[in-house]
């Protein structure tokens, strides 16, 4: 082995351990970074041709591998838009320039426009609420916005009201009634109109139904119910046209079909009227299946988006970009999209974050090993230098 080769090998070893120390330092610095994937320096030997009488020292080559496919721990948070993936898959996010990337960093919050953006400035992409898994494409995804879906006012047009009227009831005195129930409806502005529904027995199997506006007592709908004397089933009169036009609304078709006249108390089995007041979003929930559900002030819930997950054949071969994001490459394979809990993807966990997969204890151990190896390689170089000095001084 030549002295020059010895010194060259020592320098190669020092450079390799310096690379290892750099990855260890990066891992320690990002031990608390959400979604960070540990970097690891891998070594391979470089062998030079040798002869039986002379050995030529080679060197060591290094390559950095990222543990992109290794899941970090999951911790709970207080925000429903903090998202972690339990299992395979990556969130699809969009950068400021419109380029798309993959990430496990799910610390999303609404920006001033209501778009969900993570701490690195990348926007979460989602599919439509009714999108089929087979039709998913990256180009077809949109930024998830949680502020632009306020519920508009909707006037009432239809309702179902099913009751049992006691067969033992007697006709009341003039001007009286047997039973009364109040229902809520809405005009086209979303203003509430309370409807009082009166049931008055007028014959053995006949009831008069009167619908009045509770605010002024004006009758705005009426019908007569006739029941089968044997079975107590409704025979006719099961629809009431309630005219809300004078109050800024439409005609409400109130369906009483299914009502009965039988023994027992006055009971209500169904009372539903469509329509709603305008309502803003109170909060957002995200299901394990990726459904982004808006919770409105009036208690209504509506699915706004479904968050798909992406995966590649070899995740560890993706290119790492600043911000804990990854760019698919030729070595990693093509991007495949699917919804959580299907298509080989994991589940999304709301109110949680995936922590860094770097282990401080392991990193400190690696740092000590790299430090010792660096020192040993420096000793190799130093010894070669000293021997070279001896060789040079032989002429003196």
UniProtKB/Swiss-Prot annotation:
Protein name, as recorded: Flagellar hook protein FlgE
Originating species: Brucella abortus biovar 1 (strain 9-941)
Keyword Cell wall biogenesis/degradation: no
Keywords, comma-separated and alphabetical: Bacterial flagellum
Gene Ontology process terms (BP): bacterial-type flagellum-dependent swarming motility
Coiled-coil boundaries: none
SUPFAM superfamilies per record: Flagellar hook protein flgE
Pfam annotation, one family: Flg_bbr_C
GO cellular component: bacterial-type flagellum basal body; bacterial-type flagellum hook; cytosol
Subcellular location(s) of the protein: Bacterial flagellum basal body
Family statement drawn from the similarity comment of this UniProt entry: Belongs to the flagella basal body rod proteins family.
Primary location: other
PROSITE patterns tied to this protein: FLAGELLA_BB_ROD (PS00588)
């Amino acid at each position: 082995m030549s002295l020059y080769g010895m010194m060259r090998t020592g320098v190669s070893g020092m450079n390799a351990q310096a690379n290892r120390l750099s990855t260890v330092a990066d891992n320690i610095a990002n031990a608390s970074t959400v979604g960070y994937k540990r970097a690891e320096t891998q070594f391979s030997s470089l062998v030079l041709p040798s002869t039986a009488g002379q050995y030529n020292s080679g060197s060591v080559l290094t390559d950095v591998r990222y543990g992109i496919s290794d899941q970090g721990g999951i911790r709970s948070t207080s925000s429903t838009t903090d998202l972690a993936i339990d299992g395979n898959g990556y969130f699809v996010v969009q950068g400021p320039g419109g380029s798309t990337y993959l990430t496990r960093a799910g610390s999303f919050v609404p920006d001033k426009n209501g778009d969900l953006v993570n701490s690195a400035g990348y926007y979460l992409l989602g599919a439509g609420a009714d999108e089929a898994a087979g039709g998913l494409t990256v180009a077809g995804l949109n930024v998830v916005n949680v502020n632009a879906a306020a519920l508009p006012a909707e006037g009432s047009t239809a309702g179902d009201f099913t009751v049992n009227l006691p067969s033992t009831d007697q006709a009341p005195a003039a001007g009286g009634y047997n039973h009364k129930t109040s229902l809520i409806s809405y005009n086209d502005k979303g203003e509430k109109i309370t409807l009082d529904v009166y049931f008055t027995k007028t014959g053995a199997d006949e009831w008069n139904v009167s619908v009045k506006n509770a605010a002024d007592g004006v009758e705005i709908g009426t019908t007569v119910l006739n029941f089968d004397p044997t079975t107590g089933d409704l025979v006719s009169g099961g629809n009431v046209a309630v005219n809300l036009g004078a109050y800024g609304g439409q005609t409400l078709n109130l369906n009483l079909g299914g009502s009965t006249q039988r023994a027992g108390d006055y009971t209500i089995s169904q009372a539903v009227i469509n329509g709603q007041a305008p309502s803003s979003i109170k909060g957002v929930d995200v299901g394990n299946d990726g459904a982004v559900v808006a919770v409105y002030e009036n208690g209504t819930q509506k699915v706004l988006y479904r968050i798909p997950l992406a995966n590649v054949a070899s995740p560890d071969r993706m290119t790492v970009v600043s911000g804990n994001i990854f760019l698919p490459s030729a070595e990693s394979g093509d991007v495949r999209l699917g919804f959580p809990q299907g298509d080989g993807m994991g589940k999304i966990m709301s109110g949680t974050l995936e922590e860094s997969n770097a282990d401080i204890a392991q990193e400190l151990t690696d740092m000590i090993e790299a430090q010792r190896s660096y020192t040993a390689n420096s000793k190799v170089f130093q010894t070669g230098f000293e021997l070279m000095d001896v060789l040079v001084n032989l002429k003196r």
